[in-house]
């Protein structure tokens, strides 16, 4: 037993992978690397600059960024707009995992968003009756034909199968480095829910199962250093409340996400106060591990143009009240930034 104990100790002493490290041992070389390779922001931009800033500089590697919304609010359009921006404007591969819509739905909405030809005209083929709409749709179709924007319908698939789909996509389309970490990419998960009876084990309640799904997604993001933009359904409290307990399976989701935001329709009073030109939706960053979030009762104005499947970010409510612009504040230093 003494020999076994000694051998065990020897193995532990030589297990460098699991050994704790001094936090600042190589900090000088890290500073050298950072100064030699400056970035505009740490994470991948979503196309919504105020949201990116509030959560800490876009979608960071190894994080799960969660947006909660009530049904039929437009969360799928938000996911589509962000995904197409990242793939089209930045050339970064995006995988859209969708639990409800088919590939053709994404094609129609994507073309409508990029051309501002109505979704209904695209879906019915009526765009071809108008020479301008027809030419614009054809031109855009050629432009986006090869962008790295991928879709997979995962409705009804067990979560283990979904993880396998993600792993295969990383290996085949994105690529892994020598350490097994993924190259730049984003996974959009729309949305976290229980798919089928096979996912239900024993007497576990739905919120517990959603917690397990979130844990698996979180571990996957860390394992491959992939940023995940995930959407969840808000419970009925989300109609009026704007807090972390509005998410179904909220505790585990909030514990493990990097940030949690609420996307919802604006009230008639808010539309009247902000002005109808400043949107019909609002995005409320509730918590953020890396970013500064927003001040209490502030929110980002969003205009959802459902006809075209388009989401446009506006100013925050406080910016409208103060007559300021956050980008000007950024240039003058962080002290005056209205996000606190």
PLM regions and their residue ranges:
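C-terminal regions of RecA-like/P-loop NTPase motor modules
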Residues: 25, 116, 120-127, 141-144, ...
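Glycine-rich nucleotide-phosphate-binding loops and adjacent flexible coil segments
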Residues: 48, 53-231, 237-239, 245
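Core recognition of P-loop NTPase motor domains used across DNA-transaction enzymes
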Residues: 1-61, 142-145, 220, 293-295, ...
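A broad, low-specificity signal marking well-ordered, structured residues that form hydrophobic/aromatic
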Residues: 46-49, 65, 149, 283, ...
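Intrinsically disordered, low-complexity regions enriched in small/polar residues
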Residues: 4-14, 21, 26, 129, ...
């Amino acid at each position: 037993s003494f020999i076994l104990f000694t051998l065990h100790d020897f193995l532990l002493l030589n297990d460098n992978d699991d050994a704790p490290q001094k936090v600042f041992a190589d900090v000088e070389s890290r500073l050298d690397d950072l100064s030699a390779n400056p970035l505009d922001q740490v994470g991948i931009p979503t196309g919504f600059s105020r949201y990116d800033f509030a959560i800490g500089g876009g979608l960071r590697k190894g994080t799960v960024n969660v947006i909660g919304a009530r049904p039929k609010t437009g969360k799928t359009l938000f996911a589509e707009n962000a995904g197409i921006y990242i793939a089209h404007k930045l050339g970064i591969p995006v995988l859209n995992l969708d639990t409800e819509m088919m590939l053709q739905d994404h094609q129609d909405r994507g073309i409508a968003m990029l051309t501002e030809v109505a979704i209904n005209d695209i879906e019915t083929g009526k765009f071809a009756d108008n020479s301008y709409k027809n030419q614009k749709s054809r031109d855009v179709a050629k432009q986006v034909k090869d962008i790295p924007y991928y879709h997979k319908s995962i409705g009804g698939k067990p979560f283990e199968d979904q993880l396998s789909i993600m792993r295969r996509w990383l290996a085949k389309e994105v690529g892994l480095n020598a350490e097994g970490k993924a190259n730049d990419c984003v996974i959009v998960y729309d949305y976290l829910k229980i798919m089928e009876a096979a996912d239900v084990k024993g007497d576990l309640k739905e919120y517990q199962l959603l917690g397990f799904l979130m844990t698996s997604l979180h571990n996957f993001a860390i394992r491959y250093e992939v940023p995940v933009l995930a959407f969840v359904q808000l419970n009925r409290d989300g109609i009026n409340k704007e807090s972390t307990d509005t998410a179904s399976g909220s505790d585990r989701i909030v514990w493990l996400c990097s940030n949690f935001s609420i996307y919802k329709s604006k009230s008639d009073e808010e539309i009247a106060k902000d002005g109808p030109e400043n949107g019909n939706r609002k995005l409320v960053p509730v918590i953020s591990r890396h970013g500064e979030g927003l001040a209490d009762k502030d929110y980002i104005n969003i205009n959802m143009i459902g006809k075209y499947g388009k989401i446009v970010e506006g100013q925050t409510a406080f910016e409208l009240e103060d007559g300021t612009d956050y980008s000007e504040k950024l240039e003058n230093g962080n002290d005056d930034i209205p996000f606190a």
